Structures are given as C-alpha cells and as structure tokens.
C-alpha cells in the first residue's frame, strides 16, 4: 500500500462532527491538515469582525452551510459581497476582505497556500466613518488558528490614541464589532 503523507480519504462529515466544538466561538475555526503546503480551514459562525485581511495569494471560499458575506475595502471604500449557501468565490491576491458570518452554525471551507518565505499577510483596521486606515500589522502566517489571536489582542490592547482615525478623529471601538458595524451602516447609507 502506498504511503500517503496526509492519510487516506477523510470523511468530511465525520471530521465536522468531531470538531464541532472548535467551529463555534470563541475559537471559530480549525485547520484540517497541519503539515501540508495548503491551509485547508473550516470556519464556523457566528463570527463578526472589523479587521481586513490582505492576503498575498488567492483565497478560495466555499460556503457550504448557511450564509455569510465578505466586506471588501479599497481606497477607503467598502463593498459587500454575499456568500450564500453553496457559493464559491476565488478571491484575487491583495483583495482586502473582512469575512462576516452572522449566522450561528454556518460553515465555510477556506483554502489557501502556505506563504513562501518572506511573503507576509497583513491585517488592517479602518475607520467605519471615513474609511481611513487606523492600524495595519504584517505577520508571517503559518496557521490561521495559532497566528491570528495574538495579532488581534495587540490591536484590542492598544490605547484609544493608537485607535484614533488620522482622517476624522473617530476612535475605532476595538472589540465592539457591533458598534463598528453600526457606524459603517450609518455612513454607507
């Protein structure tokens, strides 16, 4: 029998059942294979956030249960792209996006390559009122599950002055995603 480095076929339904507790807040996601050149991650809802991911490579989204959406950011402008159950989206490199999963028990399969040495991801927080970048941090991303929480904590722990918008002076609400989204809704309508 051939030695398959990543094992024999995986029963995805059984894997989902076995990891159901990891696909809910506060964890919300789980990487399937740890030592592959591909990061194959299942992300569960509910999960709302106010950061935007700048991925240097393509990112594939397959929304296989429930609905979600991506909030895109470019040059201070926002756009919403809905991901309905059954939808797939291949996102081009450097498309700043903020996945929003408001539905409980929603599930999305996210597939992306591990980054080549020296190629970093970035995460930025921008002002909901005017779209100006408030903070941006680069990271060498090896594991979505392990590498992101410290980055978020760094932003959340930053002072109000460090979260003050250089464009309009509004203070980013940090962990209060709902306040950020309410402000965005007021300024987008």
From Swiss-Prot:
O2 binds at residue 49. Catalyzes the oxidative ring opening of 3-hydroxyanthranilate to 2-amino-3-carboxymuconate semialdehyde, which spontaneously cyclizes to quinolinate. This is 3-hydroxyanthranilate 3,4-dioxygenase. Homodimer. It catalyses: 3-hydroxyanthranilate + O2 = (2Z,4Z)-2-amino-3-carboxymuconate 6-semialdehyde. It is an enzyme of class 1 (oxidoreductase). GO terms for molecular function: 3-hydroxyanthranilate 3,4-dioxygenase activity; ferrous iron binding. It comes from the Bacteria. Fe cation 1 binds at residues 53, 59, 97. Pathway: Cofactor biosynthesis; NAD(+) biosynthesis; quinolinate from L-kynurenine: step 3/3. Its EC number is 1.13.11.6. GO terms for biological process: anthranilate metabolic process; L-tryptophan catabolic process; NAD biosynthetic process; quinolinate biosynthetic process. Its cofactor is Fe(2+). Belongs to the 3-HAO family. SUPFAM superfamilies: RmlC-like cupins. Fe cation 2 binds at residues 127, 130, 165, 168. Binds 2 Fe(2+) ions per subunit. Keywords: Dioxygenase, Iron, Metal-binding, Oxidoreductase, Pyridine nucleotide biosynthesis.
């Amino acid at each position: 029998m051939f030695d398959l480095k990543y094992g024999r076929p995986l029963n995805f339904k059984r894997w989902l059942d076995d990891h159901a507790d990891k696909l809910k807040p506060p964890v919300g996601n789980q990487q399937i294979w740890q030592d592959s050149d591909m990061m194959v991650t299942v992300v569960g809802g509910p999960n709302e956030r106010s950061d935007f991911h700048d991925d240097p490579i393509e990112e594939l989204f397959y929304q296989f249960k429930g609905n979600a959406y991506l909030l895109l950011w470019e040059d201070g402008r926002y756009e919403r792209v809905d991901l309905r159950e059954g939808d797939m989206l291949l996102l081009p490199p450097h498309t700043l996006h903020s996945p929003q999963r408001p539905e409980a028990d929603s599930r999305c399969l996210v597939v992306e390559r591990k980054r080549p040495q020296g190629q970093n991801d970035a995460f930025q927080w921008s002002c909901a009122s005017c779209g100006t970048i408030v903070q941006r941090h680069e990271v060498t991303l090896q594991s979505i599950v392990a590498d992101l929480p410290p980055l978020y904590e760094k932003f959340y722990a930053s002072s109000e002055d460090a979260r003050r918008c250089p464009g309009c002076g509004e203070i980013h609400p940090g962990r209060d995603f709902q306040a950020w989204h309410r402000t965005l809704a007021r300024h987008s309508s």
